[in-house]
Amino acid sequence: MSSTQPAVAKPVTQPNLSLQEKWSQQLKTVPGRLKFSRAAAIAAALLFAVLAYVSYIDLREAVQTIGRDTVPSIIAAEKVRATLADANANAVNFFLANEADDGPSWSAYRREMDEVQDNLIVAAQNITYGDEERQPIRTMMMQLAAYERLIGQARAHRQGDFHSDLDAAEQLMRDKILTAASALDKANFDHLTATYTAHRASFSGKVAPAIAGGVLLFVLLFSTQLFLAQRTRRTLNPGLVIATAVLIVCALYAVSIFPKVENSLVTAKEDAFDSIHALWRARATAFDANADESFYLLDHGNDGKQAVWTKKFYDKTTLLSAGDPDRMLVYAQQGKRFNGYLGDELANITFPGEKEAAMQTMRAWACYLDIDQQIRHLEASGKYKEALALNVGTQPGDSNWAFAQFDDALGKTLDVNQHAFDNEIAHAFDLLSHFVYALIATVVVIIAAIVIGIKPRLDEYRF
């Protein structure tokens, strides 16, 4: 009798599938598709956050560089330059009017030199661009010591021959100190121009990826919503609806503030700062020219040196308004463009009260130049004492009075633009101040809504 052995079934072996094939099979199932959509949407949300943050950083850095780093340094450099030029003019007037040691010119000179020293110490402690700023500051500090020594020597000899020391001090001021002040201004101005130009050229390109990231996330959320509606017979998934709504709100928020920040930046730079820069350069140049007028009279009797001072004076005044001042005043009243710092300002009128202040500046400048012509006519006519009295006088109709009127009007024009600049920069920072928090909250809510919204649908396929 034979026994029959039962047949042993062979185990079924699963084919070795590649990762790609496994994913392909998973995506053919509803749970697999939902898991993929969830992962893709979360990744897109994180990508959107990163791209939006990059756009934010680019915009904020531009506002920071222009509003807090370069412009204040440029203005500080121009203030130093203007104060130095005025201190130099006061030193000359001290000798020209033969004032007492406690006279107004010497007191103003000492006050301004102390102010410059304090400002340079502050500038040395706030260097942003390395040797580009450090070297001019060092030069000014070193050369100012030599300048004050020469002025002190001239003062000690002012009852005798003080001209050689005063001339040496004047040359040092113009060739070394004021040149270094201009270099400090230029270092920051070049960085401002480069930053602003690069930002304006690239801003749209840097915002575009964030927009693309938002669109990608929206498409993924919408397609997942559509897939669920088709497969689960549910019209809307609450979690995905919330995620989509939050994304739209965040996008609208970004779209609303980014152009406003950019507009504030443009207004601050092109409308306010460009005028501020022109006006500060006008002030510094005018102070320098005013010193030339005093040197012209100080060299009374020396026709050769007086001719040199006259040329220097007109070279500088032309920088403020190229051409006859009375004709330029008519041009300004008619709204016609003319060259010079004051012409640049009058061509860039933007803010309330700015035109009136700028026109008053132009009128005061024309008045000052008319009085200068009277001084030179009196000197040429042999009326030195009358010319001197007109130069150093402070009563209405005198040169110093007219110059003070000009500087006061220029200061008011500066104040209008400085106030506008400060407001625009503050507004830009205020708009950006909550963006990062809003972005973080947006991403957290979107990811949470995606996970919570899809989880119940995945749970339906578990058994």
Task: Give residue ranges: language-model regions.
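Hydrophobic secretory-pathway targeting helix
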Residues: 26, 30-62
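Extracellular/periplasmic juxtamembrane segments that couple receptor/chemosensory ectodomains to their
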Residues: 276, 281, 392-420
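Membrane-interface helix-start motif
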Residues: 192-211, 421-438
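Membrane-proximal N-terminal soluble sensing/regulatory segments of transmembrane proteins
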Residues: 62-139, 268-358
